[in-house]
Curated annotation (Swiss-Prot):
Belongs to the ETS family. The modification Phosphoserine is found at S139, S159, S315. GO terms for molecular function: DEAD/H-box RNA helicase binding; DNA-binding transcription repressor activity, RNA polymerase II-specific; RNA polymerase II transcription regulatory region sequence-specific DNA binding. One of its GO terms (cellular component) is chromatin. Transcriptional repressor that contribute to growth arrest during terminal macrophage differentiation by repressing target genes involved in Ras-dependent proliferation. Represses MMP1 promoter activity. Residues 504-513 have a biased composition (Low complexity). It is found in: Nucleus. Residues 138-202, 333-513 are annotated as: Disordered. PROSITE patterns: ETS_DOMAIN_1, ETS_DOMAIN_2, ETS_DOMAIN_3. The gene is Etv3. The modification N6-acetyllysine is found at K388. Residues 357-366, 380-392, 399-419, 451-466, 477-489 have a biased composition (Basic and acidic residues). GO terms for biological process: cellular response to granulocyte macrophage colony-stimulating factor stimulus; negative regulation of cell population proliferation; negative regulation of transcription by RNA polymerase II. This is ETS translocation variant 3.
Length: 513
């Protein structure tokens, strides 16, 4: 292979997945447009010789820093056969990935980006083996280290009964599968396929699980032979030889259980079109008796997954739904049926017109507010003033002209009778409304207004009367007092309450004068 702009070396031998030819374009090939920029960045990050150019950020999951932007742009231009490439053009291409949720810029740090690993799925090549040489597949997310394996080995040829045993981990299960791994062909394990010491690490990290013999021999004979499955789990953190890997520390410590292997956060739990278990027959989760997780380990793992995703402002990853796998709920999620710890207090609606009138009338009863005349103390006996009132009215009627004497005398008599009946009875349920006669002379109008100002606040109102709306008070007064009704028919009767009605009385008196 030419040592041109292609950085990834094509793996030799039968081990590993054989990628298509366009993934290994040489310098002479025009454009090499099949590779994407984020694939190229992952290739640079996996190469030891480019640590001075681009490297993972220590202590941050999926974060990398471009140490030499011009050199990265030059390498990218050489790969794409574009010698005019610079970092401005490359950064525009990186900004395109922001909307695609492939990576995003780290705020506050120059030339620092972070991959969204839960968004990087493998739609094209679900059968992937990551060799220790650091080969990164063209459409796959990055994995923790180059030493970890993720592949589907062929069927164990030494099985005596020929039944499907997906749970057996042996030396043959450590072999790498080719593109024909889903076919019935078997091949022997080559010692060169295994790295030095990696097999012993895997044997130490895995426990043997019981084989499923529940299937009958006759039924197995008609089934298609399927390969064993090496679970997409990763070895202990102590086995990671790469000091530059951001995944050197697993969030879950190793615990005793069926699988004594900590789960790496690089394993995306987003269900994809091609999941890691291609069919129900190949799935290791089909039977709870064959495969089970430690609930405590799963709880810690899912909690760390959710917390890391929530910190990145991403949607949480959903665990694939398998019937035999019991996943405990997250502690950080609140169930909708649980009552909220904060009680919701509803405020009353704003007071309408009637409620406002009730409040105003209550305030007037408390304050003892009076019309625009001189303020008077709220509690004054009104009997002397009312006894003096008929005499003053008689004196005023004597000084009138002859043409109005009869009408005024009749009016004064009816007022005296109304006042006499008002004080003969106990205090009614409605506030007493004083009746004034519109006089022709302005002096008499002032006397009436003074008497009215003394009379009105003197009558104590009950609490229920203060709360009663004015319309209801008028209606009750109208229904209980037939004399007032007769006076109103003649057009000479006016209610003399507080507010505009009192002003109307004064205006009528001035008009008669």
């Amino acid at each position: 292979m030419k040592a041109g702009c292609s950085i990834v070396e094509k793996p030799e031998g039968g081990g590993g997945y054989q990628f298509p030819d366009w993934a290994y374009k040489a310098e002479s090939s025009p454009g090499s447009r099949q590779i994407q920029l984020w694939h190229f960045i992952l290739e640079l990050l996996q190469k030891e010789e480019f640590r001075h150019v681009i490297a993972w950020q220590q202590g941050e999951y999926g974060e990398f820093v471009i140490k030499d932007p011009d050199e990265v742009a030059r390498l990218w231009g050489r790969r794409k056969c574009k010698p005019q490439m610079n970092y401005d053009k490359l950064s525009r291409a990186l900004r395109y990935y922001y909307n695609k949720r492939i990576l995003h810029k780290t705020k506050g740090k120059r030339f620092t980006y972070k991959f969204n690993f839960n968004k990087l799925v493998m739609p094209n090549y679900p059968f992937i083996n990551i060799r220790s040489s650091g080969v990164v597949p063209q459409s796959a997310p990055p994995v923790p280290t180059a030493s970890s394996r993720f592949h589907f080995p062929p069927l164990d040829s030494h099985s005596p009964t020929g039944d499907v045993q997906p749970g057996r981990f042996s030396a043959s299960s450590l072999s790498a599968s080719g593109p024909e791994s889903g076919v019935t062909t078997d091949r022997k394990v080559e010692p060169s396929d295994l790295e030095d010491g990696s097999a012993s690490d895997w044997h130490r990290g895995m426990d043997f699980m019981p084989s499923r013999n529940a299937l009958g021999g006759g039924a197995v004979g008609h089934q298609k032979r399927k390969p064993d499955i090496l679970l997409p789990l990763f070895t202990r953190p102590a086995m990671y030889p790469d000091p530059h890997s951001p995944f050197a520390i697993s969030p879950v410590p190793g615990r005793g259980g069926v699988l004594n292997v900590p789960i790496s956060p690089a394993l995306s739990l987003t269900p994809t079109m091609f999941s890691y278990s291609p069919s129900p027959g190949l799935s290791p989760f089909t039977s709870s008796s064959c495969f089970s997780f430690n609930p405590e380990e799963m709880k810690h793992y899912l909690h760390s997954q959710a917390c890391s995703v929530f910190n990145y402002h991403l949607s949480p990853r959903t665990f694939p739904r398998y019937p035999g796998l019991m996943v405990p709920p997250l502690q950080c999620q609140m169930h909708p049926e649980e009552p909220s710890q904060f009680s919701i207090k509803l405020q009353p609606p704003p007071a309408g017109r009637k409620n406002r009138e009730r409040v105003e009338s209550r305030e007037e009863a408390v304050r003892g507010s009076v019309p625009a005349s001189a303020p008077v103390p709220s509690r004054i006996k009104v009997e002397p003033a009312t006894e003096k009132d008929p005499d003053s009215l008689r004196q005023s009627t004597q000084g009138k002209e002859e043409q109005t004497q009869e009408v005024d005398s009749m009016r004064s008599r009816t007022i005296e009778e109304g006042k006499g009946t008002g004080f003969a009875h106990p205090s009614p349920t409605w506030p007493s409304v004083s009746i004034s006669t519109p006089s022709d002379e302005p002096l008499e109008g002032t006397e009436d207004s003074e008497d009215r100002s003394v009379r009105e606040p003197g009558v104590p109102e009950k609490k229920e009367d203060a709360l009663m709306p004015p319309k209801l008070r008028l209606k009750r007064r109208w229904n209980d007092d037939p004399e007032a009704r007769e006076l109103n028919k003649t057009g000479k009767f006016l209610w003399n309450g507080a507010g505009p009605q009192g002003l109307a009385t004064t205006a009528t008196a001035a008009a008669d004068a």
